[in-house]
């Protein structure tokens, strides 16, 4: 990403941390630039912000972000990312409109020398996904599944909300396909996971049309086709098609099933499902639950705490292991960049992280899992940390919606409860809200929603917060908690 765009995003992230005036000296020091550059950045950012959000700059006071509690800065950040030459180059590579450096330079209105600098940034970005860039012809090479993941993640960063970037495929058609998957599996995807599925599907269709092929090992294909997910979605009539004359082949179907398993969703009958799974776990007859029980036992030995009698923790680990085992066993090629949330946990809970890592590696050896990434260790660490911070005497009913995964969601709950534990009670995900069906939202038994992702509806009681909670976020939550 270009330095000027990165700096503007950093400026926004600094201003959103706290609801106060920041001095120009503070900002100069944090951003390593002059006050003149900061004022210029503020002017550009204000043009990108919605009318209700504004960055004030006053002599003698400094700089302050005016942000209503029911809005976020995601629109401004996505607008900045769309202007990034790195993204524009990746966009051209997806469309396969430029097969030489010269033709790409013409598309970007840049000299050859500047285009080569942009391509170096592209190479650095895609390397995190195990991919590389070839110049003759100009193209991205590597595992096709990773290529699709890379394109979808980059597009989601630039189009996180409601704007649809793919003109040749109607969004309504993709959403219909995803609704069909939800209906067959009796689930509701989280809103940002539903959007990710739509992007994955569209990019898959585009790549198929361009002649690219998805490949998996025979073992992955066999395991996936035997799963209940595959049988419910694809056995029977072929509903999901690239076009009216082209159905998905087996490996393309497998890719979509894998993405469903890696997505976050809620069951339409979540409470009954939870109780059924806990009963099966306690009976210990299924190997699936035996694996989870062994993991929890190893964690207890390393951490010297009781975990097996905590039903919330056990059920959370059942959910987690189902996804993690699939990632580590079936898709060892995933090489996504480390998230800020992972870095945060490693820094602030170093000892717990180390003990969980030791336990995870022991369990991994038993399960023949190799190269367990820190991202997965951090997810389990978050669940351990959350146990000691949760309280049950709460009042206001709150729904928390995040885009960072279930483990981080539990950790966020624990941090909010630590501050407002005697005032709030977190409730389970409501399928209607996640599905965007909000006609009767006022009749749902919640007092307000806390979310880290943009929602596709308006409501009087929504608090937008950062994934790593800041003082500004606690202040906004406190307003609703005190009402």
UniProtKB/Swiss-Prot annotation:
Residues 165-270, 283-394 form the PRD domain. InterPro entries: BglG_antiterminators, HTH_Mga_DNA-bd_dom, Mga_HTH, PRD, PRD_sf, WH-like_DNA-bd_sf. GO terms for biological process: regulation of DNA-templated transcription. Pfam families: HTH_Mga (PF08280), Mga (PF05043), PRD (PF00874). Keywords: Activator, Capsule biogenesis/degradation, Plasmid, Repeat, Transcription, Transcription regulation, Virulence. Induction: Transcriptionally regulated by AtxA. Transcription is also positively controlled by carbonic acid and CO(2). It comes from the Bacteria. Belongs to the AtxA/AcpA family. AcpA has a larger effect on cap gene expression than does AcpB. AcpA and AcpB regulate cap gene expression and capsule synthesis. This is Capsule synthesis positive regulator AcpA. It comes from Bacillus anthracis.
């Amino acid at each position: 990403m270009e330095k000027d765009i990165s700096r503007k995003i950093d400026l926004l992230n600094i201003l959103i941390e706290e609801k106060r005036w920041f001095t120009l000296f503070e900002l100069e020091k944090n951003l390593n630039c002059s006050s003149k550059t900061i004022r210029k950045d503020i002017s550009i950012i204000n043009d990108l912000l919605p009318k209700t959000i504004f960055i004030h700059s006053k002599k003698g006071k400094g700089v302050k972000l005016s942000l209503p509690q029911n809005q976020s800065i995601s629109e401004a950040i996505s607008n900045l990312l769309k202007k990034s030459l790195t993204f524009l180059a990746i966009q051209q590579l997806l469309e396969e409109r430029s097969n030489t450096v010269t033709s790409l330079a013409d598309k970007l209105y840049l000299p050859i020398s500047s285009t080569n600098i942009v391509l170096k940034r592209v190479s650095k970005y895609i390397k995190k996904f195990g991919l590389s860039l070839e110049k003759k012809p100009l193209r991205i090479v590597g595992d096709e599944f990773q290529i699709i993941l890379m394109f979808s993640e980059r597009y989601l960063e630039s189009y996180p909300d409601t704007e649809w970037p793919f003109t040749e495929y109607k969004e309504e058609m993709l959403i219909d396909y995803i609704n069909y998957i939800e209906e067959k599996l009796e689930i509701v995807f989280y809103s940002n996971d539903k959007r990710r599925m739509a992007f994955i599907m569209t990019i898959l269709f585009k790549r198929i049309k361009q002649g690219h092929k998805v490949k998996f090992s025979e073992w992955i294909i066999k395991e996936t086709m035997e799963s209940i997910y595959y049988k419910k979605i694809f056995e029977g009539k072929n509903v999901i098609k690239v076009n009216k004359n082209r159905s998905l082949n087996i490996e393309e179907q497998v890719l979509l099933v894998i993405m469903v398993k890696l997505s976050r969703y809620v069951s339409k009958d979540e409470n009954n499902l939870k109780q059924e799974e806990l009963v099966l776990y306690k009976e210990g007859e299924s190997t699936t639950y035996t694996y989870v029980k062994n993991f929890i036992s190893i964690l207890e030995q390393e951490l010297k705490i009781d975990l097996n009698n905590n039903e919330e923790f056990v059920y959370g680990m059942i959910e987690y292991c189902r996804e993690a085992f699939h990632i580590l066993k079936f898709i060892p090629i995933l090489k996504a960049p480390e998230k800020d949330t992972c870095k945060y946990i490693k820094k602030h809970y170093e000892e717990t992280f180390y003990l969980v890592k030791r336990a995870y590696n022991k369990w991994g050896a038993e399960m023949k899992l190799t190269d367990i990434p820190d991202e997965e260790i951090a997810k389990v660490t978050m669940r351990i940390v959350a146990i000691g911070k949760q309280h049950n005497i709460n009042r206001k009913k709150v729904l928390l919606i995040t885009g960072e995964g279930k483990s981080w969601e539990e950790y966020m709950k624990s941090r909010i409860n630590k501050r407002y534990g005697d005032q709030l009670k977190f409730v389970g995900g409501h399928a209607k809200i996640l599905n965007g069906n909000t006609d009767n939202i006022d009749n749902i038994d919640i007092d307000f929603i806390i979310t880290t992702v943009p929602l596709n509806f308006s409501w009087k009681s929504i608090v937008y917060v950062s994934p790593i909670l800041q003082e500004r976020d606690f202040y906004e939550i406190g307003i609703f908690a005190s009402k």
